[in-house]
Amino acid sequence: MELNKIYCIDALEGLKQLEDESVDLIITSPPYNKHGLRNNGRPVTNNNLKSAAVQRSWVQSIAYGGDYNVDNMKEEDYERWQIEILNECYRVLKKDGSMFYNHKNRLYGGEVYSPYKWLYKTKLMVHQEIVWDMGATPIVSPIRWLPTTERIYWLTKGKQTKFNRNKNGDIKSEVWRINRATRNNHPAPFPIKLVDTILDGFPSDEKLIVLDPFCGSSTTCISAIKKGYDYLGFEKFQEYVDLSNDRIKKFTEK
């Protein structure tokens, strides 16, 4: 595949077109299957949309390319899909490559569902768990503390990585306090500070290749451009490919 492009392609299909050990860094956040966990992949009806919060979330999922199914799979199918994606990421990562996988603990039936359920079934090693403190949440529960955090799982093929936390003289903890990004016609954009923080830990005189297989509005790719690295983005929906290309064009023309 040609570098420094956003491809309108399904994440798994795009990954399968990449050569073995061809990517230095993967930074991504897949759909969370929030509705699939709740509805077990059943078609959504008015009976499923009992709360205003669920209705808002449903509308956001419809906005995600107009395809509700992207966030409404049977949970076992979703987990199998994530395992397949992650194992393809393992294949395309270089031996000292790293993947940063943003996900969250989800609630179902009063119990927390952790991404570790499927992470430990992949070929990747969990090198470190980073807590992303977003500082605010639209979700308020009378029986729980406010859920203001998500997780960024640093996944590797082994112990060796390109990480160098000392080169820039800035040593960070594993808790990152970074506010949510302002929406940019995508329902769940990455804050660029989050991706910048990751890439700052991988200073290199080489042109590293950075991949985002769920690139959305391409914040990962823009951060890679800032660092002088090459990028690849996969996005299933053409409207977000167009949004990405527009954002990249505006950024590079500054």
What are these regions (language model features)?
Residues M1-M134, I143, P147, T156, ...:
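S-adenosyl-L-methionine-dependent nucleic acid methyltransferase catalytic domains
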Residues I152:
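Short hydrophobic/aromatic beta-strand element in the GNAT-like acyltransferase core
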Residues Q160-F163:
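Short helix-loop capping/hinge motifs at secondary-structure junctions, enriched
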